[in-house]
Amino acid sequence: MNHAFSFMLAAALLAPATTLAQDTTTSAQVKRGEYLVTTGLCHDCHTPLIQGPDGPAPDMKRALSGHPQEIVVKAPAIVPEPWTGAMSPTLTTWSGPWGVSFTANLTPDPETGVLRDFTEQQFIQTMRTGRHQGQGRRILPPMPWPWIGKMTDDDLKAVFAYLRQIPAVKNKVPDPIPPK
């Protein structure tokens, strides 16, 4: 058997094993991301609540799609002293001294998903700096980016990998409303 044939045979036999190892790593990374998103309570704000027979429940058909585009908010809520903020019944709109913030659509929808143009590194920078794509406008309350930003690079990469593969939900979240 000549060396060229031996090399090609070895490469052909090893390629599926390499691909399998990569798929396993990716699958493990996505599972880790799902675990972190779930236990990190991302659904609490990024998945709208709907009223059911037992009270509010997450609308999993809209999982992680942010503030529903059909619910229009035009101005910050006015709250009496000593309160400083208010939230919508869907838990996707928050109003306070910063104005009104709407939870982002974290799904990979190519038109409306906030992460559609992010690289993995930009996602990590966003979580570490509190700025969109690591350099844009600041992320508004109640997003707990200072704590999420303390996650390891591997954990943030896992979260990003998970968010990139969840079902896309077309939902255009409005821009924040500045304070009056």
Task: Give each language-model segment a name.
Residues 1-5:
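Positively charged n-region of N-terminal signal peptides that target proteins for export
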Residues 6-16:
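Bacterial N-terminal signal peptides
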Residues 19-38, 50-56, 111-112:
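Electrostatic cytochrome c docking/interface patches
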Residues 33, 39-49, 159, 163:
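The canonical Cys-X-X-Cys-His
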Residues 38, 102, 139:
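Residues that flank catalytic or metal-binding motifs in active/ligand-binding sites
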Residues 43-72:
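N-terminal, post-signal-peptide region of Sec/Tat-exported proteins
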Residues 62-122, 146-156:
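Electron-transfer interface patches adjacent to heme c in soluble/periplasmic c-type cytochromes
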Residues 117-133, 145-174:
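C-terminal capping alpha-helices of c-type cytochrome domains
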